[in-house]
Amino acid sequence: MTRLHVLHVDDEPDIREVAALSLELDADMSLTSAASGGEALDLLQRDLRPDVILLDVMMPELDGPGTLAQLRELPGHERTPVIFMTARAQSSEVNRYIALGAIGVIVKPFDPMSLAASVRGALADAGR
């Protein structure tokens, strides 16, 4: 299996830490974390090329959907897979996130032991 590089964007330090511990336990994944949409966009503009982005929906200043819209304008990131992470998992919300271009949604709180499998599953479902 190919090693996946994940960019995880979340304003909550505890969520970033749990995700980092979970994903770094998986020998087939490497991780870069960002505390805001703006920080993530800066990293991407400096040639970070993740295989997938885990993107929190609700963040101050620049939320997940706003970050995704700006991400799609960056050369080389028009099709980077994005998985939204949210506590709002009503079907109308999930459908909205998919319509915005996400390949999947992970509901918070998430099971740290299955986070890597959830990422792989969303990528497989999207044919990536």
Please describe what each predicted stretch is.
Residues 59:
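Receiver (REC) domain active-site loop signature in two-component systems and cognate sites
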